[in-house]
């Protein structure tokens, strides 16, 4: 099958892990370039060792590479601030963009929830690591019954949080909360991230709370289980930490939530852990692994749709 050439902008943890995933194999994507800004970057050195074109001159360096005219998709694994400049340049050159930063210029995309991408879409946003891990669960509850409120808490090892992640904390919470509503289907969303300094490092753990009307608990339990299996198809280390828990609140004992008010109905609690595949990053970095796995899936879907359109 014909493949679409792609580039990765950002040679840090996320960019390098994505590089390894793409080089391990893809039916629709061929990695043609890796871009950084540090000539001594380990990610750039690994790319060169594997025969991939590199530049340490950022987006302008990418545009000067001989392979650039043939590149159809660029993955941006830098920062929300830098992405705005990168997107403008890439759009001007007719490239498709998969945004792994919280910039959220384009529509959100979560593989097991998002469907066919509109042919006019030029930029898709991968939300955040916490969003990729938790939004599928919110969506799993939403397909059973309307979710009035959803709150997620993502706890990740501080070792897995590089400078890009730390610089984007505010964007993380805003973007994730917004995507919980838009993609997950919640009436209102809230997101919290915790950088866990524990040693040895803990794997990613996520807690998802949803508030709904009183419904069949077995239906929610089955929907969550099915969604977990769907995510495991591309993130094998994604799993339930324990059984789904339920708590009912009546008018005589409503649940009080700051900033939301009183709630009467069913509270569903889902506890997850995400272990990384260990492609480049340590297995405790499941937060980064789910992001790169989802980005690869998004890029492959974009490439497949464009290649099919050209062949038609």
UniProtKB/Swiss-Prot annotation:
Question: Any idea of its EC number?
Answer: 1.2.1.10
UniProt cross-references to SUPFAM superfamilies, sorted A to Z: Glyceraldehyde-3-phosphate dehydrogenase-like, C-terminal domain, NAD(P)-binding Rossmann-fold domains
Q: Which residues form the active site?
A: 129
List ligand-binding residues for NAD(+). 11-14, 160-168, 287
Q: Could you give a GO molecular-function term held by this entry?
A: NAD binding
A single Pfam family it belongs to is AcetDehyd-dimer
- Keyword Acetylation in the entry? The reply is no
* Domain of life from the UniProt record: Bacteria
Q: Which family does it belong to?
A: Belongs to the acetaldehyde dehydrogenase family.
What name has this protein been given in UniProt?
Answer: Acetaldehyde dehydrogenase
Species source reads Sphingobium yanoikuyae
Lineage, highest ranks first = Bacteria, Pseudomonadati, Pseudomonadota, Alphaproteobacteria, Sphingomonadales
């Amino acid at each position: 099958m014909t493949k679409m050439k792609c580039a990765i902008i950002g040679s840090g943890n996320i960019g390098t892990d994505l590089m390894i995933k793409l080089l391990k194999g893809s039916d629709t994507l061929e990695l043609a370039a890796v871009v950084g800004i540090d000539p001594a970057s380990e990610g750039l050195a690994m790319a060169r060792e594997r025969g991939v074109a590199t530049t340490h001159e950022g987006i302008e360096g990418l545009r000067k590479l001989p392979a650039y005219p043939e590149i159809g998709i660029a993955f941006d694994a830098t920062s929300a601030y830098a992405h705005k400049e990168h997107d403008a340049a890439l759009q001007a050159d007719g490239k498709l963009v998969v945004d792994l930063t919280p910039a959220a210029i384009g529509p959100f995309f979560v593989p097991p929830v998002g469907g066919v991408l509109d042919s006019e879409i030029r930029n898709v946003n991968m939300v955040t690591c916490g969003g990729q891990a938790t939004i599928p669960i919110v969506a799993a509850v939403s397909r059973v019954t309307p979710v009035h409120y959803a709150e997620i808490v993502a706890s990740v090892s501080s070792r897995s949080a590089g400078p890009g992640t730390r610089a984007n904390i505010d964007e993380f919470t805003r973007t994730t909360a917004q995507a919980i509503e838009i993609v997950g289907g919640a009436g209102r969303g809230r997101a919290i991230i915790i950088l866990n300094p524990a040693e040895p490092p803990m794997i990613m753990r996520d807690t998802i709370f949803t508030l709904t009307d009183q419904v069949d608990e077995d239906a929610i339990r089955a929907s969550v289980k099915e969604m977990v299996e769907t995510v495991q198809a591309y993130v094998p280390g994604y799993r339930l930490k324990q059984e789904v828990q339920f708590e009912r609140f009546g008018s005589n004992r409503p649940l009080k939530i700051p900033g939301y008010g009183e709630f009467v109905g069913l509270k569903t609690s889902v506890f997850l852990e995400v272990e990384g595949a260990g492609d480049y990053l340590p297995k405790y970095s499941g937060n980064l692994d789910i992001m790169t796995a989802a980005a690869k899936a998004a890029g492959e879907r974009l490439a497949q749709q464009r290649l099919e359109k050209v062949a038609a």
